Structures are given as structure tokens and as C-alpha cells.
Amino acid sequence: MYERRHERGMCDRAVEMTDVGATAAPTGPIARGSVARVGAATALAVACVYTVIYLAARDLPPACFSIFAVFWGALGIATGATHGLLQETTREVRWVRSTQIVAGHRTHPLRVAGMIGTVAAVVIAGSSPLWSRQLFVEGRWLSVGLLSVGVAGFCAQATLLGALAGVDRWTQYGSLMVTDAVIRLAVAAAAVVIGWGLAGYLWAATAGAVAWLLMLMASPTARSAASLLTPGGIATFVRGAAHSITAAGASAILVMGFPVLLKVTSDQLGAKGGAVILAVTLTRAPLLVPLSAMQGNLIAHFVDRRTQRLRALIAPALVVGGIGAVGMLAAGLTGPWLLRVGFGPDYQTGGALLAWLTAAAVAIAMLTLTGAAAVAAALHRAYLLGWVSATVASTLLLLLPMPLETRTVIALLFGPTVGIAIHVAALARRPD
């Protein structure tokens, strides 16, 4: 009797997972249709992000822009950590589709994300007297409030993205990304029109945290994905997510939170710091923003090819390397002119610096790839160790007694190689 009930439960579960994916074409994570959907959404999201940064840089003086950039970076660190929920949810949902389901506890990822987001918001707000004065030199309490609420919202948003990726709902996945970016752009545009100043851009940075609610209200497919359960209890899910969240937080320090890292390791940023931060942001965005947006595709791809860990890395790595090579050439030849024309004479940098910063972006992109492969293989400790080691190495390199531009390039170029080596070594080991 137990075997019959167990088989019936497995069949019911399989039907449930199939129903969620039944409304769209059966395309895989790197099939042409899937990549096209996410790629188009990413292009729109990148355009919105670039426009927000452009509006802030044009509307604010360099010294004030560096204040905005530090908040943007702090939010990036916190919300980047929530990508651990995206990764773990994608992996768990994907595994449910490709492996047999045994009887036992089930977890609702979106509810867990709500609990994690609430705890994170309370911790950020409660601990803010210890660190906010040093980090937020203007608009301190507004920054703390927006950061706390924004993180709670982005926890739920990342989990919904992970569920959509796990069941190949790439149209809704892309729509959620675009909704987030468009909301931010709309608030930034309003800040320009009404002369809101720095506060307006702080609101713009966090406004996208409500996008997941709008998606749930508008899309039955999103509601179906959000209702999915994964094997194991809450403790099992949280243990796996904890490694991913910690590692994603470390990755966010290098990817989104680098202005914060510069602030911590420098006496004063000033106008020069604002120019360097803008250069770092613009040279890495063409690679890292799309790559971050396609984390769901990548993890689903690596899960599907988990018996060929290193071979599955080759094609994405070649694409990243090719784009990076073209980007280095373009940044070196046209970057200084584009900065001068687009952002004004206060933002002047040399072509060599822009080319080297683009090379550094390639290094971080490769680390992002190997990290996604490690998550897909359930190598949580290796994933965590790789990103934390890369972040520590980059931080130490930023302390070198060199000009700001030089140590920035060295830190962003060589720090990630430590993490890449750790990830590749773990992936090279024979699966158990």
C-alpha cells in the first residue's frame, strides 16, 4: 500500500510540475527561444540601468554622484546577496523536474524568502547606528530605510525569478526583470523633472523592489511558479541557500558594491573617485548586467549537464571572452571620447585605464560563470570559498600603496582569478 501511495504521490507531483510548464513552448535554458527572450529583456534592462546612471551623473556633481554610487553599491551588495535565493530556488526546482521525488517534507521557497527578507530588514535597520554614519554621509536615515525595505522586496523577487527559471518560464522571467528596471527609470526621470536631487535617485535605486508584486498580480503563470514546493524541510532549503546567499553577497561586493569597497579602503573619494567609479560601472555593465540577468539560464543549463561539469563551461566562457576582447578594443579607442561627450569634462579617464577595467570585467564574468556551475553541481562550500577568497584578495590588493586607478585595476583583475581557480578545481573532481 505504501509503495502505491508513494508512486501516486510521485505521479501527482510530476503532473504538478508539468502543468506549470505547459503553457509555453518546451524550450531549454540555452535554447534559441529562451536566450532570445531573456536577451531582449536584458537589453531593455541594461538600457534602463545605463539611463539611470546617466541621469544621476548628469544631474549631480561628481562628488555628489559618488555619494549616490556608494548607496547604489550598498544596495547592490545587499540585493546581490539575494541572488543566492534565485540560485538555490532554480537548482531545487530544476532538480524536482529531473529526479525522482521521495516522500517527506516540502518547502515553499517564496514563504522562506519572505521570512529571510524580514529578518534581513530588521538586522539592517537595527545595526545601522554602527555603520551608517561612515557609509552614508548625506541622507543617512533615508538611505537606511530604503535599504532595509528594498532588501526585503528583492528577497521575494529573486526567489520568484528562480522559480520561473526552474520551470523554463523565460517570458515571465524577462518581464519581471524589465518591470524592475522600468520602475527605477521612471522614478529617476521624475527626479530630474521635479528637481528632487540626491534623494530622488536613492528612491529610484530601490523602487524596483515592488516589481514581483506587480508580476504576481498580472501573471497566472508567475502565481503558479510561486506556489511550487521543493523537496525537504525549511532547514534543508535554508542551509543550501545560506551558502549561496553568503557567496552571492561576496560576489555582489565585487560586482555591484565596489564603490563601497573603494570607500572603505580610501580616505576620500571626491571627484576623482566619482570618475573612477563611473568608469568601472560603464566598462563592466555590458558584460556583468546580462550575465547576472541570465543566472537562471546558466544554472538550469549546468544542472541539465551536471555529468559534464567542465565541458558545459566552454561555450559560455568563449562567448564571454569574445565579447570582452571586443569591449577592450572599443573601450580603449572610443571610451574617453564617449565619457567626455556623454557625461561632461569632469569625468575624464584615459583609454588604457578603460581597456584594463574592461579586462577586469571579463575576469569577474568568468568567476560568475564558474560560480554558477558550482551552484548547479551543489558544490556550495566551493562556491562560497571561491567568491569569499576573490573578495578578500581584491580588498587586500586595494590596500596597495598605489594611485587609485592602478590599485583598482589590479584588485579587479587579479582578485577574481583566486576564486576561479577554486571553482574549477572543485568542478574537476569526479562527482560522488
Swiss-Prot record:
Key word Ubl conjugation present: no
Example of a GO cellular component annotation carried by this entry: plasma membrane
Intracellular or extracellular location(s): Cell membrane
Transmembrane segments: 35-55, 60-80, 112-132, 144-164, 185-205, 209-229, 242-262, 274-294, 313-333, 359-379, 384-404, 408-428
Ranges in coiled-coil conformation: none
Membrane topology recorded in Swiss-Prot or TrEMBL: Multi-pass membrane protein
Main localization, broad class: membrane
GO molecular-function terms, A-Z: host cell surface binding
Keywords: Cell membrane, Membrane, Transmembrane, Transmembrane helix
Family recorded in the similarity comment: To M.tuberculosis Rv3630 and M.bovis Mb3654.
Protein name per the record: Uncharacterized protein Rv1510
Gene source species: Mycobacterium tuberculosis (strain ATCC 25618 / H37Rv)
